[in-house]
């Protein structure tokens, strides 16, 4: 990417110059206020101007973008295959592993395998988790846990499921939440804003949801309580300007309107917003959705190049297995879990201790979330 700097009087002027001079291949990367002497070196005549850094995409950038799109197409095709096999067979053939006879597992291992399946984890994935947690006991000629059950299963789940445990400490600059209607994106964004601020991050919030007045007012009121800047963007250009105005923030949270993953036109419209800057997109899914609906959402929202997953409404299902299956099969890192409407209490930063407890224990025993955030 070729970098150029221009000096202007306002962000609006910068955008107009960039569009006229560089066209669609350019993006504004950052801006800062500087002072320039108008008459020699006399400091009293220094004028404030805006220095804007512009990135112009070159052939190599387009090649990398093409490669990313090709990888994205492969991921979507793989998800389509998974969905079709789940519809037709109830399982994914490619996950078939070497089955061990029931007598080859120690009794306690069999109990935990049953518990995983009862929690709605796919039998193939449950077997994989159990096998990775076990070693062969030569004396008794059975497979048993390598350590205590919790420790062994935690190590296995850590091997098979990706979590981003550093999301709050080291967030991307711009975090956008997308997902189907009704999964709780706006409430989740408010919870994240509180967590980031609690961890000494300078936070900004931008809403792209121009359809729901109630959601806008709710988020605006919360931003005022947190004392963080809040903006509403009704166009990609306005969004670009607001991102630049919040360039001093450590993390900028972007709320989007809920969209049906079948509404391709609305999704394409949202895509135009995300072309203006380097944005990390996190797909928000309710844990009580059917597994097939989750995969369908991932396929459609996959056009945004998903950086990770957020699972909400864990309090509304006693069977978190579908969530585990999706995380395992897509290998997208999970960044947080939410449960309930209370802000900021009902959120847990993704961590393996919580996930193992969620899978192995009853809902009431894992509900105290704030201690783990």
UniProtKB/Swiss-Prot annotation:
An example Gene Ontology biological process: bacterial-type flagellum organization
Pfam (any one): SRP54
Superkingdom classification of source: Bacteria
UniProt entry tagged with the keyword GTP-binding: yes
Main localisation: membrane
Binding site for GTP: 179-186, 255-259, 312-315
GO cellular component terms listed in the entry, alphabetical order: plasma membrane
Keyword RNA-binding: no
GO molecular function per UniProt: ATP hydrolysis activity; GTP binding; GTPase activity; signal recognition particle binding
Compartment annotation: Cell membrane
Family matches, as Gene3D superfamilies: Flagellar FlhF biosynthesis protein, N domain, P-loop containing nucleotide triphosphate hydrolases
Protein topology in the membrane: Peripheral membrane protein
Record key words, sorted: Bacterial flagellum biogenesis, Bacterial flagellum protein export, Cell membrane, GTP-binding, Membrane, Nucleotide-binding, Protein transport, Transport
InterPro entries xref list: AAA+_ATPase (IPR003593), FlhF__GTPase_dom (IPR047040), P-loop_NTPase (IPR027417), SRP54_GTPase_dom (IPR000897)
PANTHER family: FLAGELLAR BIOSYNTHESIS PROTEIN FLHF, SIGNAL RECOGNITION PARTICLE RECEPTOR SUBUNIT ALPHA
Function: Necessary for flagellar biosynthesis. May be involved in translocation of the flagellum.
Family, similarity comment: Belongs to the GTP-binding SRP family.
Protein name: Flagellar biosynthesis protein FlhF
Organism this protein belongs to: Aquifex aeolicus (strain VF5)
